[in-house]
From Swiss-Prot:
Annotated source species: Enterococcus faecium (Streptococcus faecium)
First-level EC class: oxidoreductase
UniProt xrefs under PANTHER family: 2-HYDROXYACID DEHYDROGENASE HOMOLOG 1-RELATED
InterPro entries: D-isomer_2_OHA_DH_cat_dom, D-isomer_DH_CS, D-isomer_DH_CS1, D-isomer_DH_NAD-bd, NAD(P)-bd_dom_sf
Induction: By vancomycin, mediated by VanS/VanR.
Alphabetized Gene3D superfamilies for the sequence: NAD(P)-binding Rossmann-like Domain
Any Pfam family: 2-Hacid_dh
Protein encoded by which gene: vanH
Reactions mediated catalytically: a (2R)-2-hydroxycarboxylate + NADP(+) = a 2-oxocarboxylate + NADPH + H(+); a (2R)-2-hydroxycarboxylate + NAD(+) = a 2-oxocarboxylate + NADH + H(+); (R)-lactate + NADP(+) = pyruvate + NADPH + H(+); (R)-lactate + NAD(+) = pyruvate + NADH + H(+)
pH dependence comment: Optimum pH is 5.6.
GO BP annotations, alphabetical order: cell wall organization; response to antibiotic
Protein name: D-specific alpha-keto acid dehydrogenase
Reported function: Required for high-level resistance to glycopeptide antibiotics. Catalyzes the reduction of 2-keto acids to 2-D-hydroxy acids, exhibiting highest catalytic efficiency with pyruvate and 2-oxobutanoate/alpha-ketobutyrate as substrates, producing D-lactate and (2R)-hydroxybutanoate, respectively. Together with D-alanine--D-lactate ligase VanA, gives rise to peptidoglycan precursors that terminate in the depsipeptide D-alanine-D-lactate rather than the dipeptide D-alanine-D-alanine thus preventing vancomycin binding. Shows a slight preference for NADPH over NADH as the electron donor.
Amino acid sequence: MNNIGITVYGCEQDEADAFHALSPRFGVMATIINANVSESNAKSAPFNQCISVGHKSEISASILLALKRAGVKYISTRSIGCNHIDTTAAKRMGITVDNVAYSPDSVADYTMMLILMAVRNVKSIVRSVEKHDFRLDSDRGKVLSDMTVGVVGTGQIGKAVIERLRGFGCKVLAYSRSRSIEVNYVPFDELLQNSDIVTLHVPLNTDTHYIISHEQIQRMKQGAFLINTGRGPLVDTYELVKALENGKLGGAALDVLEGEEEFFYSDCTQKPIDNQFLLKLQRMPNVIITPHTAYYTEQALRDTVEKTIKNCLDFERRQEHE
C-alpha cells in the first residue's frame, strides 16, 4: 500500500507532536489542522479519504455534506463517544464513523480519585488550608470499605473501575445492558436505592440522555454521592443542583457537565461565565468540578493517536479489497 493521507482536525500541539512521531512508522502522511472541522475547512487536505476529529468538534449534517463533497469517506473520532457527530446523517451519506477505544486506565484511575475526594470532603479541606484555617472540618469523611458503590455501565471503563473498587473492599453493584464480568448485576432502580455512591460509565445516546433526573435522584439513598466521568447530559443538571441544595444528595464529583462546551478548554479568567448551574455547583463545598480531563494522560494520548492511525489504515485496506 502506498502512503495514505489523514487530515487531523482540532489538533492540540501535544497531539500534533504524537501524530508527527507515529505517522512515519505506519507509512502515513498526517496533515494537521489546528481548527475544528467546519464547512469552510473541509477541503483543507483534498484527496484524503480519512479524517480524524476530536470530541470537541460538533459535526452536523451540513459539515458532513461538505466533507463528502471533498471526498471524505471515513471519520475516526479521537474519543470513545460519538455523540458529537450526526451519525445518522453520516450513514445516509455513506461516511463511516469509528471511535477510538483507548486504554480505560486513565479514566478509571481518575474516577477513583474523584470518589475518594468526594467521600473525604477534600474540596472543603483544601479550601480551608488555602485560607490558613487548619481546624478539622466538623463533617467527618467516610470509609470506602463501609460503602456500596453502584457502577452504571460495565464496558471497558466500568470494568476497570470495578477492578479498582474491589481493592478497597467495598460492596459493588452494577447495572448494564450487557453482562460482561463477574459482578452483582441488579436492576437500575435497585442500584439507585442501595448505593451510597453512583458512578456513570455509559455512552451518551437517546436512551441514556438524562439517565439521572428527578425520578432517579428521588430513588437514590439520602446523602448519596454522584460521580460522572462519562458525558455531561447523562445528568439533568437542574435536578442535580436542586438535590444538592436540599440535601437529598451528599455531594457530587463531575468531570463532565451539561453545556460544558461553553467554557471547558477555554481560559475564562478574564471573562464572565453566564452558566448559572456551573456557578452554583462551584460554590458548593461538596461538589468537585474538573474540565473533562479524566482521559488526559500521556498513555491515553499515545493510545489514541496510534489507534486513530490504525483505524484509518484498516479502512483503506477494506476499500482496496472491495
